[in-house]
Amino acid sequence: NKMGKAHIKRLAAPKSWPINRKTNVWVLKSSPGSHTLGTSLPIGLIIKEILGYVKTTKETKYVLNQKKIFVNGKLVKNQKLPAGILDVVTIGEDNYRIIINQKGKLIPVKINGAESKLILKQVENKKSLKGKKTQINFTDGTNLLSEEKYATGDTIVFSNEKIKEHLILEKGSMVYVLAGKQVGKIGIIKEIQEKKGLQPSRVTFTQGKEDYETSKEYVFVVGKTKPLVTLEK
């Protein structure tokens, strides 16, 4: 089934996609890559259905051929390329950051040109190489060679592809919850409970006057006292 490879049935599309499930049966599917289906949106879906820059797939391909669409500053030629949570999507002069709201929906929010230069990447794991170099692997599939000390779960902030800041996953850091019951919430870490064995590590964070708990793997450090980027519409 040719349609099945590039498309999925709307009713089977991830719940995180903010789409109308009752129109055409099929919806564009992301190409496999750095992001899972539920944590990213295909570029074609963003520019056609969600933001309405174009009305047809033919128009989408035309705009891509004009070399005006970028994700995190890199040119996009394929409409199936996924843009994930906190990625920056540039369409001509307009910039958007993909956020996840408290209903668990992925939403592109408009940001200014200065903010569009800020890219946040979370450390997934590290690999020691010969010499003193370490390969830092990020959750978006990219990597970096470095001699600096970065831990799994930390965030590295890039500006114009240069490292601007290192945000540590620790008590007092500001985090954004990407999944689970507390999805979309932003708060300050109160406690990290490292678990051994089969139990996952947990994070207790404070938002306003309330404390919440979530899995450590669901949190993304976004600042020290306030978020460095737009996280709400």
Regions found by a protein language model. Give the residues of each.
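Ferredoxin-like alpha/beta domains used as RNA- or RNAP-binding modules
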Residues: 1-233
